[in-house]
Amino acid sequence: MIETLITFIIIFGIIVAIHEYGHLWWAKRSGILVREYAVGMGPKIFAHQAKDGTLYTIRILPLGGYVRLAGWGDDKTEIKKGQAASLVVSKSEVVNPEAENSVSNIVRRINLSEHVELEEAIPMLITEYDFEKELFIEGEVFGEIKRYSVDHDATIIEEDGTEVRIAPLDVQYQSAGVFHKMLTNFGGPLNNFILGIIAFIVLTFVQGGVPSTTNAIGQVEKGTPAYNAGLKAGDKIEAVNGTKTADWNNVVTEISGSKGKELKLEVSRSGKSETLSVTPKKMDGSYRVGIMQSMKTGFFDKITGGFVQAGQSATAIFKALGSLIARPSLDKLGGPVAIYQLSGQAARAGFPAIVYLLAMLSINLGIVNLFPIPVLDGGKIVLNIIEAIRGKALSQEKESIITMVGVVFMLVLFVAVTWNDILRAFVN
């Protein structure tokens, strides 16, 4: 139980953290202010406020993660007319806060919280402000109306004590070029593909190499029909009962289809050909003789093998998606419960199985996130493409409606898949 839980949390944490970091990295490279980078959902169990204005958090529920960008959704701190605040301005002005305001007055921090006290802060009753374009704040200070310039990177301490940076238009998501928006949205899936490839490369090194497709035997297990028949590592099986076997798949097909009958193997050994007789036995549900295929153990063979396995996994996922579209069924989908079960199986099987599961799930997440469904990365990229074609973005109201439709759809699907996983795990 504990082993399964730890494995699940590690796999989930790595996949989500890498995915969200892809969004964060491209957003920052595009000049977009990242409010928060979160792994998990729900209440925070860890938080760190970085100097660049990004809050890094780990949250208690392993149900996903997110990157909150400035200008995305409900991002603004509401300040009411007449609201009390305290301002920290440039040091030269703090000495005499009643002096005439000048252009050099720069506000660094704006405190709206009654629970936070700032040293040498100027009290103000706010009457007007603009933190997006003109960057100023105006209000009553010691009985006079004062207007202060606000620093581009100034922070606001909200009523609950949370300190956030203001977001001028130039650092908001909407102000980024459409290409940079697309990179920001594609960054998550891209990182999942990279993680999947790296995990498969690690797996090839752990396994000692990449399975070769040739008809050469890599290893013969002792006490098996092949061992008793005299087969050795390095032998090439050229034919089975007269049927040519050009690669390993041909060899496996002929042996597994024998139904336990004696086979005549034409073997090439050290340039010489000989025929050996072997009778397959049923092992783990199929007929086998106890031979293993040879491995490519070169450094670059292992590297390229990781790429090949990643490509094969992606192909298998696309085939599964095609089957799902042709014949929709919840049994073909899996949510957190199914992933938890797979994590338990991988933990019991050992480290290679854990790495394999990590690779498969990462590539799976990358592909699924590119579906053109609002709220998923693919849906956001579609909106970016529409913006590129139209020459302007959809209004925030329209984008919000489209996103809400996607949220409802994904929420209903999530509940249905999770319930089906529970029934499959505990009822069936």
From Swiss-Prot:
Return any one Pfam family short name. Answer: Peptidase_M50
Indicate how the chain sits in the lipid bilayer.
Answer: Multi-pass membrane protein
Q: Where is the PDZ domain?
A: 188-282
Q: Where are the transmembrane segments?
A: 188-210, 354-376, 401-423
Which cofactor does this sequence's record say it needs?
A: Zn(2+)
Cellular component, GO annotation: plasma membrane
* Family membership noted in the UniProt record: Belongs to the peptidase M50B family.
Stored NCBIfam families: RIP metalloprotease RseP
Its recorded name reads Putative zinc metalloprotease LL2128
Species assigned in the record: Lactococcus lactis subsp. lactis (strain IL1403) (Streptococcus lactis)
